[in-house]
Amino acid sequence: MRNFEDLQIAVAGTGYVGLSIATLLAQHHKVTAVDIIPEKVEKINNRISPIQDEYIEKYFAEKELNLTATLDGASAYKDADFVVIAAPTNYDPVKNFFDTHHIEDVIDLVLSVNPEATMVIKSTIPVGYCRSLYVKYAQNFAQMEPCLLYTSDAAD
């Protein structure tokens, strides 16, 4: 049986979903949050929430967190046991289309530096998307769970 203590977890994306997951997991595991926006990374590393959420702000101020942030996805994913993908998937109502390229960019990078990592997609995705990833990558993904958080209760 796998030991789930002292895991190294990378979280791709630091919006409401990604940052709340990273913050909660960082209470018990080493977590590296990855984002492409330098200001967000700097704020997280200085324990300032880049998003307005009272719970995340409270956790940053009061909890012992093993959380760092980086712009370098490859270094974060290289030694990760799990990679939580919380990348944006913008929906275009005119085309009736979810833009999932950010998810696939993360998957491609993870597979190139750490093909043994377990990837968990937490981004909002269209029905059947995980099946298409399985066909494309011949990979098993641990979980598909669309985001259903209220914006003011990200860490609740």
List each language-model region with its residue ranges.
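Conserved small/polar residues in nucleotide/adenosyl-binding loops
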Residues: Y150-D156
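NAD(P)+-binding Rossmann beta1-loop-alpha1 motif at the extreme N-terminus of oxidoreductases
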Residues: R2-I48
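Short glycine-/small-residue-rich Rossmann-like dinucleotide-binding loops
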Residues: A87-T89, T124
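Conserved N-terminal Rossmann-fold NAD(P) cofactor-binding segment
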Residues: I36-F82, T89-N96, Y137-Q143
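A general structural motif
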Residues: D6, A80, E116-A117
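Redox-cofactor binding/interface segments in oxidoreductases and associated redox assembly factors
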Residues: V84-I85, I121
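A structural signal for isolated positions on well-ordered beta-strands in alpha/beta enzyme cores
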Residues: A10, T32, T68, T118-V120
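Rossmann-fold NAD(P)-binding glycine/threonine-rich loop
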Residues: F97-L148
